[in-house]
């Protein structure tokens, strides 16, 4: 194989752990792992380690958990490892310019979109939300900007009509490690060909919020159906009935024109709960009332038919 590189890995969630796992079997030398501090989790608010910390400790790797990389003493932790390259995957901390310049080959990042489209915090969700036909991963050389560095390698995958953010996350978690290993080989061989991002093609993937996930019936049925998939598994599209939030897990579009006001219930039967939108009809197929499990529209109608009387309006 190519030259074995000394690598610092920085990441936090499961998505990052899949990349570290691939690195550990690649023949490269992971000399240290940076991850976020343990966080309170669960009902007992017990301090829990990140998936990266768990994996790194299982493998006997040195683990560092600074709150910030701005203090000089924390930057020294990076310098002391004398790495060839630092691999950053969903780390969650800003890397100051001094840290970016420490490794011989700099720092590289795996981003969950085909840059320059969807720079920012929620690229997987926004690609679905916007109705993109494909997405993928970009491995880029990091600089001080937000996902602005030169692109080193890309892998793409189609977005299907059934994809949710959850399924797309899994697809990209398979692609990312493949792209990472290829990029490291090119960096080691000196064959990497950095490509500058075209600033005219930039879009930004803003963070999601629970309020954005509230169903706005003035939007088109097609847009709402995409939102339902984009916001699954978080924050989940929802509507309010009698003061209670009801999550929507699945819906379909019925391409039939209607003059009914957006939010008007048109039909409620075993085929679903059909609601007028700003353009077309949205057929609600799977819902989850507060405190209950997700269920089919038919099962919900069996217990709460009064919520979905045709002619009534959802707000």
UniProtKB/Swiss-Prot annotation:
GO cellular component: cytosol
PROSITE patterns: GART
Recorded family membership: Belongs to the Fmt family.
Catalytic reaction annotation: L-methionyl-tRNA(fMet) + (6R)-10-formyltetrahydrofolate = N-formyl-L-methionyl-tRNA(fMet) + (6S)-5,6,7,8-tetrahydrofolate + H(+)
Family matches, as NCBIfam families: fmt
Keywords: Protein biosynthesis, Transferase
Presence of keyword Disulfide bond: no
InterPro entries: Fmt (IPR005794), Formyl_trans_C (IPR005793), Formyl_trans_C_sf (IPR037022), Formyl_transf_N (IPR002376), Formyl_transf_N_sf (IPR036477), Formyl_transferase-like_C_sf (IPR011034), GART_AS (IPR001555), Met-tRNA-FMT_C (IPR044135)
Residues annotated as binding (6S)-5,6,7,8-tetrahydrofolate: 113-116
Its EC number(s): 2.1.2.9
Protein name: Methionyl-tRNA formyltransferase
Function: Attaches a formyl group to the free amino group of methionyl-tRNA(fMet). The formyl group appears to play a dual role in the initiator identity of N-formylmethionyl-tRNA by promoting its recognition by IF2 and preventing the misappropriation of this tRNA by the elongation apparatus.
Pfam families referenced in this protein's UniProt entry, alphabetically: Formyl_trans_C, Formyl_trans_N
Record keyword Protein biosynthesis present: yes
GO molecular function: methionyl-tRNA formyltransferase activity
Cross-referenced Gene3D superfamilies: Formyl transferase, C-terminal domain, Formyl transferase, N-terminal domain
HAMAP family assigned to the protein according to its UniProt record, in alphabetical order: Formyl_trans (MF_00182)
UniProt xrefs under CDD domains: FMT_core_Met-tRNA-FMT_N (cd08646), Met_tRNA_FMT_C (cd08704)
């Amino acid at each position: 194989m190519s030259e074995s590189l000394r690598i610092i890995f920085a990441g936090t969630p499961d998505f990052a752990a899949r990349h570290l796992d691939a690195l550990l079997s690649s023949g490269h030398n992971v000399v240290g792992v940076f991850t976020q501090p343990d966080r309170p989790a669960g009902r007992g608010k017990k301090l829990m380690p990140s998936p990266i910390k768990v994996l790194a400790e299982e493998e006997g790797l040195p683990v560092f958990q600074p709150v910030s990389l701005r203090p000089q003493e924390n930057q020294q932790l990076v310098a002391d490892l004398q790495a060839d390259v630092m691999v950053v995957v969903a780390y969650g901390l800003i890397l100051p310019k001094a840290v970016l310049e420490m490794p011989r080959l700099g720092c590289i990042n795996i981003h969950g979109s085909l840059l320059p489209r969807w720079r920012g915090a929620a690229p997987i969700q926004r690609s679905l939300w916007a109705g993109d036909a494909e997405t993928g991963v970009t491995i880029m050389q990091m600089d001080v900007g937000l996902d602005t560095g030169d692109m080193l390698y890309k892998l793409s995958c189609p977005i299907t009509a059934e994809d949710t953010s959850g399924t797309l996350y899994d697809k990209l978690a398979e692609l990312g490690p493949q792209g990472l290993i290829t990029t490291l080989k090119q960096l080691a061989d000196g064959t990497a060909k950095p490509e500058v991002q075209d600033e005219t093609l930039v879009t930004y993937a803003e963070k999601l919020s629970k309020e954005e996930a509230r169903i706005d019936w003035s939007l088109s049925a097609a847009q709402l159906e995409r939102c339902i998939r984009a916001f699954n598994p978080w924050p989940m599209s929802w509507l309010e009935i009698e003061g209670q939030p009801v999550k929507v897990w699945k819906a379909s579009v019925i391409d039939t024109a209607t003059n009914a006001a957006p939010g008007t219930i048109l039909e409620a039967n075993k085929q679903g709960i059909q609601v007028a939108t700003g353009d077309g009809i949205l057929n609600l197929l799977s819902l989850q009332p507060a405190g209950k499990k997700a269920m089919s529209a038919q099962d919900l109608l069996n217990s709460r038919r009064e919520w979905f009387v045709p002619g009534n309006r959802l707000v």
